[in-house]
């Protein structure tokens, strides 16, 4: 009899009989594509989620080890948290390509849940396992700090800044895709799921100047 692994994802009980990386279950079964697959080996942090309140990389946690745990992704943030992070990251310019941002947000949430008013050094430590190739981290650090201030009630949200009511030369403005990228709704190629979708992988010869005489496709069928 196969074993069943049960856990709670964003408040919803889930279970599976298949032991595999939690990342694959969240993306392929639940379609929670805010959990990005940047490396599949725990190096980049784009798949950062909360597991029992702690920041964890979903690609290195199996469904078996996740059994009995409470899991939260960006989709499971409260309305107040979503609005705080969207505004903060947009206001400081923390979003560029956006691929790393949901993981940064979850690392930031894990910190703010434990320490609502962190120092810059504490924010840097909290995101040390998250890689960003665009921003140089400064804006992301500022974004987490501002999100914390908003959630503490020490900073306010200016809706006009996001809505762009007074755009003009030299005016501050959000990127138009900030909300989707912060909340993990921006679609990248790997986020597309189609019925009957096939996958391909490049296979290269181990030998230089080798001539391919035959291909056995049985493993792929």
Regions from the PLM with identified roles:
Residues 1-162, 179:
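Signature of N-terminal electron-transfer/Fe-S-associated modules in redox systems
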Residues 148-221:
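Flexible, low-hydrophobicity surface segments
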